[in-house]
Amino acid sequence: MATFAHDVFSNLIANIFSSLILLIAGFLVGRWSDYTRQTRSFRRIFGKRAGKSSDLLIVLDSIQDTRLLPEPQRHTIGIQNPAGSNLTQRFFKAFPDGHITTIPGPMESLLPECSARGAAYLIEAFRGVRGISAKTTPDKTASLKWNGTFITLGSSYSNIKTDDIKNLPENLWLVDDAGKFTFRDGTAIQVEQRYDKGLVMKLNNPHTDGQTLIVCEGLGEWGTSGSAWFLASQWRKLSKRFGKNPFLICLSVTVGTDESAREVKAFGVEHWMWRMKKYFHLACL
């Protein structure tokens, strides 16, 4: 009887121990599978070297106060100072309690609020990818470099690096972004009363292997931050859809709501598996 009880107890302990081993092994395998799948998705869209062996740079646009320009430069570009402008207190800040302060402001460059929002979306998204770190850099600094993966925020009229990328021969789609997006197929997209427009374009970096160039820009400030939100939240899906291929996605963004960004036009060669899934989905409708 004692031997039987001992055998039952031993079998119970062995079963519990083996179950724990299987549970832990399954958990670790699942985590490893998630990690490798996420890493592969990240590398397909941002490049195999991005954020590890080379920089992953979020390039911020900057603008300057025209009142600081010398008179000859203002005259050249057709800008006149407003009457009675005060160069010592150029900006104001309104507080919730109603009081207002005046400040000189920066003497060199200003960062648009939409670019700050966009950078925050991207940095938060990349924090979830193990081993990946992103840095922000001003467009003036980034314009001197090509070694790295660059994500630019702002149009070619406010971000020097966006202008550099727009003028690459590898850009097969975007002609210009001055007031409207004009494309090489002859189409154009403009801002509507309630909707800004955004654009996410990815090119493979022609100057270095394993790195990419991505533009997040907008017609209207919500177009810029909305496009950055779209990339930050949808990069895994974009990776499945396009693989390593270049692409351009045009977006419509409700003013005041970055998370409303939705696709209205797309260019690029989709992965064959994505096309097959889309075909079967349409066939079943």
Predicted regions and their residues:
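Solvent-exposed alpha-helical segments and adjacent loops
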Residues: W32-L285
